[in-house]
């Protein structure tokens, strides 16, 4: 049976850390920023780490060769 292909959309959205955790960009910064406070916008910067079970599912189904 051939190897599973990595989903290209997931490849762009998620990164695997050296310890095996899955990082992703914070959501909610594409549009509609006018109604958010400066504090809310500032807190949306950077990346977050997924919960272990969610990260395991991402690695299993979308990033099988990572």
From Swiss-Prot:
* Keywords annotated in UniProt: Ribonucleoprotein, Ribosomal protein
Q: Give the signal peptide range.
A: none
Please, one GO biological process term? translation
Q: Name one Pfam family in it.
A: Ribosomal_L35p
Q: Where is this region: Disordered?
A: 20-40
Q: Which InterPro entries match?
A: Ribosomal_bL35, Ribosomal_bL35-like, Ribosomal_bL35_CS, Ribosomal_bL35_sf
Q: Which GO terms describe its molecular function?
A: structural constituent of ribosome
Question: Can you name a GO cellular component term?
Answer: cytosolic large ribosomal subunit
SUPFAM superfamilies, alphabetized:
L35p-like
The entry's family comment says: Belongs to the bacterial ribosomal protein bL35 family.
What name appears for this protein in its UniProt entry?
Large ribosomal subunit protein bL35
**Which species expresses this protein natively?**
Nitrobacter winogradskyi (strain ATCC 25391 / DSM 10237 / CIP 104748 / NCIMB 11846 / Nb-255)
């Amino acid at each position: 049976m051939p190897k599973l292909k990595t989903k290209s959309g997931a490849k762009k959205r998620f990164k695997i850390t050296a310890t095996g955790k899955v990082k992703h960009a914070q959501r909610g910064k594409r549009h509609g920023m006018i109604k958010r406070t400066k504090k809310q916008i500032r807190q949306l910067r950077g990346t977050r780490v997924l919960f272990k079970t969610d990260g395991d599912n991402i690695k299993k189904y979308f990033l099988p060769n990572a």
